[in-house]
Curated annotation (Swiss-Prot):
Keywords: mRNA processing, Nucleus, Phosphoprotein, RNA-binding. The modification Phosphothreonine is found at residues 221, 226. Its main location: nucleus. The keyword Phosphoprotein applies. It comes from Drosophila melanogaster (Fruit fly). One of its GO terms (cellular component) is mRNA cleavage and polyadenylation specificity factor complex. Belongs to the metallo-beta-lactamase superfamily. RNA-metabolizing metallo-beta-lactamase-like family. CPSF2/YSH1 subfamily. InterPro entries: Beta_Casp, CPSF2, Cpsf2_C, CPSF2_MBL, Metallo-B-lactamas, RibonucZ/Hydroxyglut_hydro, RMMBL. It is found in: Nucleus. It comes from the Eukaryota. It holds the Pfam family CPSF100_C. This is Probable cleavage and polyadenylation specificity factor subunit 2.
Length: 756
């Protein structure tokens, strides 16, 4: 491999932080995932902010926030503008993840890291691919192709194969699963034969999973014991990834009449549950062969649930039939979303059960419950929620919003409560605005010229308007139509309302989400539902049973090491794992695979070029203008004489950086080749470049009317007077008497080479 390969580990190295890496192939910089954790840690964003304008492509491997959570922020706030590639399910389900993430945090506070508009803008830039579809990068990435392969972890999950033309391949494989599940097939790593470079994770290197049968029995036993004890079950799941496996499993369990679970309610609760299931119905071809064959044979969609109720709010859960409930709710970390709300309500009841299905980052509520949660333990939580504005607060909000939307709107006069009918009250009750007849100015002392008909105005005030007309009829006042009613909605022409991109509101996506989420035309601006944030500190006594049952869908440590032994990569970069887990994978690759192993630290840039004596040198414009190129077989070549130098090149940074950020911008150094003076250029022997085949040269001689024939591996020309034969080291020897034909054949021979 002659390309210079580097990897910058921005996040996800020697720890379990979200994956975010920059892979550099010569001058092409590719961002591999851009995850964000539950706390929205901004430390790695500072480093990524300096690199965002140097990126040439982005590859997304999974749809959850742990792999693409920072994408809306990069596009909406940092101005990321390069091609983004993902599979179709990652595109669709990724939107659902980010919608639900935004709404979950917005309902708990003022969330301003990104908006739903940023989510839509980011996902509009994604190029959607299918498995095994090879796409060539453009512009600077010319010559590099990418291919997505099935990872088996989530629907649409991807192992990326990156290949540069004429060179070996690079495989980016993290969070893969080799086991077949109910709704997904296993990964396809066996199709990759000894990759040149493998970038893989050590997340499960020291983790041993329970067998699938034991895991499922543990879940079913917990549910049965809880509901029969008149308790509720809260299952913390993600939005649109691993939840599909659990939902399909539980719906099948509820169909079994012998289980007796049909008497209890089963619900899926998140902000976009309806859309998640609808997307799952349309993506059967991305799932396991078993589901695909069942769908093709019986025409029965496996995600047409008969027992799962789709809920989008706690109010929907309360409307379910009375009695024990099993609720699949987001998010799995219990830091936000409906899982936190239900935890606050159900944790104190000893009959209830809380099931955690995945490992989360240290410091989250879910991790705290798993590590140290004895029965009766008290936990202090900040409980924040939004409530609708009412009464005076609602009136004040509507008045303020109305003035912001249109400063021409004048506050309507409040109906007089007093029965006083003084002349001043009558004057103040006159409706202000534009009139075609003369009216008395308000707030100004008046003379007796205007006669006030007090009794008439008190009963039924009537103001005659003079209609203005021109050659085409009555003049239309556009303001009358722009302000349609008092609710603050703007008037939109009918042709704008009939645009194809306007759809009806779907369950699970509210008015604000439809407006900001790109489902409604941007010209239609709907007011947010007026709410306020209420925060209080609560002490929760955890009496409910807390269990963690693994439904992560990743390969265990033992299986992962066996897969690495089968792949036999030449070089391995181990990322995304604890220091101990990283060393376990590194030692296995060194001892059993025989590969060069790299274990970078967070923020480190490592050079994994296969040839250690390759350097990248930039030619100056003056030197390039003096080169004399000779045309070869597939390219043009030239001899270069120059002096090696060093130039400093600053890394491009955003224009809106602060003073501290600007000072932290590092400068990169690049090697250059400078022009030599004429008396400094050394003399060199001519070099002939080409791999000549005598059979091809025989055709050249025939085109020039020179007879030739092979005999004993020698090409005889001119009736056997000249001989051409190949000697060692790829040289061609020419023997014969000096003659006119000798020089003619030699000239034709020289033309087959690029001489520099």
């Amino acid at each position: 491999m002659t390309s210079i390969i580097k990897l910058h580990t921005i996040s996800g190295a020697m720890d379990e932080s979200p994956p975010c890496y920059i892979l550099q192939i010569d001058d092409v910089r590719i961002l591999l995932d851009c995850g964000w954790d539950e706390k929205f840690d901004a430390n790695f964003i500072k480093e990524l902010k300096r690199q965002v304008h140097t990126l040439d492509a982005v590859l997304l491997s999974h749809p959850d926030a742990y792999h693409l959570g920072a994408l809306p922020y990069l596009v909406g706030k940092l101005g990321l503008n390069c091609p983004i590639y993902a599979t179709i399910p990652v595109f669709k389900m990724g939107q659902m993840f980010m919608y639900d993430l935004y709404m979950s945090h917005f309902n708990m506070g003022d969330f301003d890291l990104f908006s739903l508009d940023d989510v839509d803008t980011a996902f509009e830039k994604i190029t959607q691919l299918k498995y095994n579809q090879t796409v060539s990068l453009k512009d600077k990435g010319y010559g590099i192709s990418i291919t997505p392969l099935n990872a088996g972890h989530m629907i649409g999950g991807t192992i990326w194969k990156i290949v540069k033309v004429g060179e070996e391949d690079i495989v980016y494989a993290t969070d893969f699963n080799h086991k077949k599940e109910r709704h997904l097939s296993g990964c396809e790593l066996d199709r990759l034969q000894r990759p040149s470079l493998l970038i893989t994770d050590a997340y499960n290197a020291q983790y041993q999973q329970a067998r699938r049968r034991a895991r499922d029995e543990k879940l079913m036993t917990n549910i049965l014991q809880t509901v029969r004890n008149n308790g509720n079950v809260l299952i913390a799941v993600d939005t649109a990834g691993r939840v599909l496996e659990l939902a399909h499993m539980l719906d099948q369990l509820w169909k079994n009449k012998e289980s007796g679970l049909m008497a209890y309610s089963l619900a899926l609760l998140n902000n976009v549950s309806y859309n998640v299931i609808e997307f799952a119905k349309s993506q059967i071809e991305w799932m396991s062969d078993k589901l695909t064959k069942a769908f093709e044979g019986a025409r029965n969609n496996p995600f047409q649930f008969k027992h799962i109720q789709l809920c989008h709010s706690l109010a929907d859960v309360y409307k379910l039939p009375a009695g024990p409930k099993v609720v699949l709710a987001s998010t799995p970390d219990l830091e936000s979303g409906f899982t936190r709300d239900l935890f606050v309500q159900w944790a104190s009841n000893a009959n209830n059960s809380i099931i955690l299905t995945t490992r989360t980052s240290p410091g989250t509520l879910a991790m705290e419950l798993v590590e140290n949660c004895a029965p009766g333990k008290q936990i202090e939580l900040d409980v924040r929620r939004r409530v609708d504005l009412e009464g005076a607060e609602l009136e004040e909000y509507l008045r303020t919003q109305g003035e912001k939307l249109n400063p021409l709107i004048v506050k309507p006069d409040v109906e007089e409560e007093s029965s006083s009918e003084s002349e001043d009250d009558i004057e103040m009750s006159v409706i202000t605005g534009k009139h075609d007849i003369v009216v008395r100015p308000e707030g100004r002392h008046h003379s007796g010229f205007f006669k006030s008909n007090k009794r008439h105005h008190v009963m039924f005030p009537y103001h005659e308007e003079k209609v203005k007309c021109d050659e085409y009829g009555e003049i239309i006042n556009l303001d009358d139509y722009r302000i349609a009613d008092a609710t603050g909605y703007e008037f939109v022409p009918m042709e704008e309302q009939n645009k194809e991109n306007v759809k009806k509101e779907e369950p699970g996506i509210g008015a604000e989400q439809q407006a900001n989420g790109g489902i409604v035309d941007n010209d239609v601006q709907l007011l947010e539902k007026p709410t306020k944030l209420i925060s209080q500190r609560k002490t929760i006594e955890v009496n409910a049973q807390v269990q963690r049952i693994d439904f992560e869908g990743r390969s265990d440590g033992e299986s992962m090491l066996k897969i690495l032994s089968q792949l036999r990569p030449r070089r391995v970069i181990v990322i995304h794992g604890t220091a101990e887990g990283t060393q376990v994978v590194a030692r296995h690759c060194e001892q059993n695979v025989g590969a060069r192993v790299f274990t970078p630290q967070k923020g480190e840039i490592i050079d994994v070029t296969s040839e250690i004596h390759i350097y990248q040198v930039r030619l100056t414009e003056g030197l390039v203008s003096q080169l004399q190129f000779q045309k070869g077989k597939d390219a043009e070549v030239a001899w270069v004489d120059g002096r090696l130098g060093m130039r400093v090149k600053a890394i491009e940074a955003p224009m809106d950086v602060t003073v501290e950020q600007d000072a932290s911008v590092q400068e990169g150094k690049t090697l250059t080749l400078e022009t030599l003076a004429d008396d400094e250029i050394p003399i060199h022997n001519s070099v002939l470049i080409n791999e000549l085949k005598l059979s091809d040269f025989k055709q050249t001689l025939m085109r020039n009317n020179i007879n030739s024939e092979f005999s004993g591996g020698v090409l005889w020309c001119s009736n056997g007077t000249l001989a051409l034969r190949r000697v060692d080291a790829g040289k061609v020897a020419m023997e014969g008497c000096l003659s006119e034909e000798y020089y003619k054949i030699r000239e034709l021979l020289y033309e087959q080479y690029a001489i520099v």
